[in-house]
């Protein structure tokens, strides 16, 4: 996976495969540390080490590389990856990456990743937050609320898709999440 956007899509896909209907994403940057927390209401994880590439619930192949690659990407910068079951059910995944580290991957187009997820899995509610420096969380997109306002056919229009993308991208750039790391 070439960038963090690829890793995010993989995590979101894991949530969907675990029958999640609601996925909450919190992103932020604090002291050159990018952090991401994803919570879902899916089926949870077994006690196995899901960061072992030879542990997978997949039936088609006996290898799962997504989480091991994310763990390596995080730890190679001095960051971390934690995955655990939520008390409410589902999974909580948190990772941190030192974006000032020479081995840090670029962000990639995270806004496009979210739009692709929203359109790929229309029955899943995605609630996206950014965490400000003062630790306040700001909701920047909620697919469930949008679907209450906009019809399915309207959602398919390019103008609506572009509006959703621009809205998410604008908010991510406010906390310096752009397709490249840039200079802080």
Language-model-detected regions and their locations in the chain:
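N-terminal assembly/transducer modules of large multi-domain enzymes
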Residues: 99-184
